Amino acid sequence: MTKYIFVTGGVVSSLGKGIAAASIAAILESRGLKVTMLKLDPYINVDPGTMSPFQHGEVFVTEDGAETDLDLGHYERFIHAKMKKSNNFTTGQVYESVITKERRGDYLGGTVQVIPHITDEIKLKMGEGAADADVAIVEIGGTVGDIESLPFLEAIRQMRSNHGRKNTLYVHLSYVPYIATAGEIKTKPTQHSVKELREIGIQPDILLCRMDRELPEDEKRKIALFCNVEENAVIGCYDSDSIYKVPGMLHAQGIDDIIAEQLQLDLPQADLSAWDRIIDAIEKPDHAIKIAMVGKYVDLTESYKSLTEALKHAGIHTRTKVDIIYVDSEEIERDGAESLRDMDAILVPGGFGKRGVEGKIKAVKFARENDIPYLGICLGMQIALIEYARDVAGMAGANSTEFDLDTNFPVVALIDEWVNHDGKIEKRDENSNMGGTMRLGGQQCDLVPGSLAARVYGSTEITERHRHRYEVNNYYIQRLEQAGLTISGRSAGHEKLVETIELTGHRWFFACQFHPEFTSTPRDGHPLFIAYVKAALAHQADKQAS
């Protein structure tokens, strides 16, 4: 039987429940358990796919094409399990499923209510997501006390009755503030947060105290007494300069031994040596580079979470401190791209909408003309192709139909047919719904032998994850290739969509339609980002030598 660990958060949001949950998972995995993770989101949206990055942050795409919470990215980076659609569900999905069953007559004329029907559906979906794992760690989104979270909290309360104490464990992450003017740590917010949980019927087994300083023993005893938790189960979760230090931090305080004892697990000792090597590379870099990330969501860097982590992973594997300089593309649109001259490399990430596009085009042109390593991802590839069409291939005014429906050269256009992750043909047009209608998930790509892409990946067949609605217009490919653009990768399906482009006369110029950042991990990195960081290092060395 799968054992469940439920992680809740209290006092304030954005405490790092996802990191804490993923760190616990990493420790348990290192002790030989098969671990999976679930995120339960209390918002009514079916998924975050149509939500603004400024509200929700990054949308993480799974291999099977689910648009999910960014915490699933943390899960994949901390443990070896690959997330699926069943690892993330929302209030919207739960209600949609229950209403569908009611319309179908599944409830035999009964009155459909939050309890038991909604809570039963939540438990059913948790069971599906947990599958055949030894342990499933379930993170409940939101903050204890929010009305939206109540059905989820009731469902996890019932799980102890359904599965027993030896198969369920509750972890509560709470904020313990330090009041500088008083010079005191305040435990009252945590006491009240636990009181809220206990009123619902949940008694935390472990308390994680989110703090900016170490938790004194007397305060630990106080929290244990008033929250009815064993003193050794009151664990500090402190600010850290790297999220990859958290597994070691929690393990040092014995969290995995507490879990093993309550869940009656006989486990080998934890082996966190891989995490020790990661931390060593982070703390002792041999090099340092500056990469300009030119985007439109730079005021909320969570929008590019997987991408920034992928660059850090590449830094780990090249022992390089990667300093990411976030550049607002609207500033470049207004002031020009000269500010990018001192950068060791330039990157244009994915995005949607017209705002800031011309600034990104200027950034690509600057990288191309000044032989600065360039990496374009998703929209960043489309932007590179538009710039090349305009400034090299002689297609004045070339654009994407996303930004200009009346352009004379629609070199990027709405994709209307493709083969999805399951091998089925998908069709879309301008009248299709916005939600869940993009080209999503892992897709096979064939690379040209001898190309930069093939050399980087060490293969001519790869699979990468996608999330886009627009594609390179194949009608203009021949003209672009005649002007010197290299199409080095295409989709494996009959539609042969453009997946990667290169400039062979450039130091290092590569752009891809897919999102390689979604499969990068601190343990293994990703070959594309590692190659990109190496190119930036080479460019830096040449600048210093000249």
Curated annotation (Swiss-Prot):
Give the GO cellular component terms, alphabetically. Answer: cytosol
Task: Quote the record's binding site residues for CTP.
Answer: S13, D146, I147, E148, K186, T187, K188, P189, T190, Q191, K222
Superkingdom per UniProt: Bacteria
A GO molecular function term, named singly, is: identical protein binding
**Which cysteines link up through disulfide bonds?**
none
Instruction: Spell out the activity regulation.
Output: Allosterically activated by GTP, when glutamine is the substrate; GTP has no effect on the reaction when ammonia is the substrate. The allosteric effector GTP functions by stabilizing the protein conformation that binds the tetrahedral intermediate(s) formed during glutamine hydrolysis. Inhibited by the product CTP, via allosteric rather than competitive inhibition.
A GO biological process held by the record: 'de novo' CTP biosynthetic process
Query: What does the record give as the reaction this protein catalyses?
Result: UTP + L-glutamine + ATP + H2O = CTP + L-glutamate + ADP + phosphate + 2 H(+); L-glutamine + H2O = L-glutamate + NH4(+); UTP + NH4(+) + ATP = CTP + ADP + phosphate + 2 H(+)
Q: How does it assemble?
A: Homotetramer.
What family is it from?
Belongs to the CTP synthase family.
Q: What is the recorded name of this protein?
A: CTP synthase
Native source species:
Chromobacterium violaceum (strain ATCC 12472 / DSM 30191 / JCM 1249 / CCUG 213 / NBRC 12614 / NCIMB 9131 / NCTC 9757 / MK)
- The gene designation is pyrG
